[in-house]
A protein has these predicted regions:
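Walker A/P-loop-proximal flanking segment of P-loop NTPase domains
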Residues: 1-18, 24, 28-29
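Conserved phosphate-binding/catalytic loops and adjacent sensor/switch elements of nucleotide-binding enzymes
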Residues: 20, 25-102, 112-114
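Conserved AAA+ ATPase core "coupling" helix
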Residues: 166-177
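Phosphate/oxyanion-binding loops and surfaces in catalytic or ligand/nucleic-acid-binding neighborhoods
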Residues: 32, 59-66, 98, 113, ...
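Short beta-strand segments
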Residues: 14-16, 39-41, 106-109, 137-140, ...
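Loop-to-helix "switch" segment enriched in basic
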Residues: 152-153, 157-163, 168, 182-233
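A conserved switch/coupling segment of P-loop NTPase cores
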Residues: 3-7, 31-34, 84-165, 180
Length: 233
């Protein structure tokens, strides 16, 4: 689905709760997409327009050193609502003018600044204008606001929600089999985690570690006690 979105849309939003597998999916795709990757992990302190763009621009300049930040940061520093659309247009212009490989811009945890008044107007102007060699991939714990959601009908935005991210029972069995675990163990883990990717993977790793430790434990009671004492030291 991400590959299809990369080819047909300008942007993708991966939405789901903590542990749904958003970051894992974004990381795997960034590794195989064949593009340079600018990665910005948003923090709650980035709510201020100027701060957000400082980090976003810095991530892009790591991959495109010639990316011109001067006009962007001048507008971002002014922090006026009537500058937002102009800011989006200048940002796109600099992406068009800049030289470099095709680019994937990953904005992780955008929900951290979802209450910012400038965010939706900026994205609604910015995402549809992106050049073909730039794709924006957003991860968020919240679904896109209504104005962004409507962009799906214009083939500008692809949304991958938690239901799409979740493992099916069959996929859970396949995952557990790679750790040498049974389908019964996979079924119980699936029921506990509701198929959430990170939680399911954690269960598989933990059960495999427990199985390996039990398998390697000495059979002789004396040896077993000595081994337990060694681990306690």
């Amino acid at each position: 689905m991400l590959r299809s979105s990369l080819e047909s849309c300008t942007s993708t939003v991966i939405s789901g709760r903590a542990g749904a597998g958003k970051t894992a999916l974004a990381t795997d795709f960034a590794r195989i997409c064949g593009r340079s990757v600018a990665w910005y992990k948003v923090d709650a302190a980035d709510l201020e327009l100027r701060v957000f763009f400082e980090y976003l621009v810095a991530s892009i300049r790591q991959e495109r050193p010639g990316f011109n930040e001067q006009n962007i940061m001048a507008l971002a520093g002014a922090a006026k609502s009537d500058h937002i659309l102009r800011l989006a247009e200048i940002f796109v212009y600099e992406l068009l003018e800049g030289e470099g490989n095709p680019l994937l811009i990953v904005i992780e945890d955008l929900h951290q600044v979802c209450d910012a008044e400038w965010l939706v107007p900026f994205l609604c102007r910015f995402l549809p204008l992106l050049p073909r060699d730039v794709h924006v991939l957003i991860t968020s714990r919240t679904l896109p606001p209504a104005p962004l959601w409507r962009m799906r009908s214009k083939q500008t935005l692809e949304v991958i929600d938690e239901a799409t991210l979740a493992f099916t029972p069959e996929e859970a069995v396949e995952l557990f089999e790679t750790y040498g675990l049974s389908s019964e163990q996979a079924r119980h883990a699936f029921e506990r985690t509701h198929g959430r990717a990170a939680a399911l993977a954690t269960q598989a790793v933990a059960q495999n570690k427990s199985r390996t430790a039990h398998k390697n434990r000495p059979n002789d009671p004396v040896e077993r006690r000595l081994a337990d004492q060694d681990r306690a030291l």
